[in-house]
């Protein structure tokens, strides 16, 4: 998977966008340093001084509390992590941290498909499955930062394989990119029938 990055004006105009590889080995210890380094290089390339930057917004595929802390990020290998503090220390810039689906929903409400609306629901599909719910212009965060986290609702109580979160039968195990790949591999292992998926070694 990749980390998507963007450089924007305060009016939301895209100055540049790019992506970097998500290095999840060793409990994802390289993810934040890689982001900080990618930002440093981009600012240098654009000849933008760090002091001119209002701040960094980071969307994390996990519940995030008000202090910018996550307890468990299945897809990145993080356990307890003070994302806000670490990002600010690594970058030397102010950082705001939120659940990725929530911040995506806020972006859509500001300038995208939800522009002009105060109440929207957004579903994100990728490595995982996420959900962002905006009510009266504010994200529904929930008591533990997991409001809208539909990817870890149990949809199959008979599942025996574990999700990245540690539970079984989560929606993410079936509807995400990784989940669909898992299901395809299970099906391919059942017989040796001809398959394009088998030929491409999914």
Residue positions per predicted region:
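Asp-based phosphoryl-transfer active-site loop
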Residues: 1
